[in-house]
Amino acid sequence: MGKRPLRVFLDSNIILSRLLSDKGAPRIILDLLSIGLPFLIGLTGRYNLVEIERNLKKKMPGILSVYKVYFPKLSLKIIPLPPEEELREYFGKIADKDIPVLVSAIRGKADFLVTGDKQHFEKIKAREEYPLRIVTPSEFIDSILPEIFKELKEK
């Protein structure tokens, strides 16, 4: 993994998926981030937090209290909302609602943007114009687990 910790930006759907299920790749990712591995830093955006809370209040208000207890345990670094002028550069490249997610991940110097949103992120995923890899939760697990085991073995 090298000297610098990997920075992993989580889209809202990854955090929501974990709240709704005890299984799957989102669970593994958030569990890894919550144990405080020194070579893995979790990030999300202020925009994502607003989106999560809005969705929970609207669709699953009973889970909001669980989220408020659970979220601080993740120790994610929160990337502030990007300024409007920074967002403009990305109009037309991705769905408007996802621009703040992509820009927040870039501003947070993420190595990975983990999202379950295949519909909107799939078309930009293969482009090399972004300084990060856009991956699904299982793609992230497949790429990172061997590195984690290697890092832990060396300790």
Where in this protein do the model-derived segments appear?
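Active-site neighborhoods of divalent-metal-dependent phosphate/nucleic-acid chemistry enzymes
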Residues: 77-116
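Intrinsically disordered, low-complexity and often Lys/Arg-enriched segments
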Residues: 1-6, 154-155
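Acidic, PIN/NYN-like endoribonuclease modules and their adjacent C-terminal/linker elements
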Residues: 119-155
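PIN/NYN-family metal-dependent endoribonuclease catalytic core
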Residues: 9-10, 22, 26-57
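Short, hydrophobic/glycine-enriched beta-strand segments
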Residues: 7-16
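Alpha-helix capping/helix-boundary segments
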Residues: 14-15, 48, 101, 119-120
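Domain-scale selection of a single, long terminal region
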Residues: 46, 50-85, 101
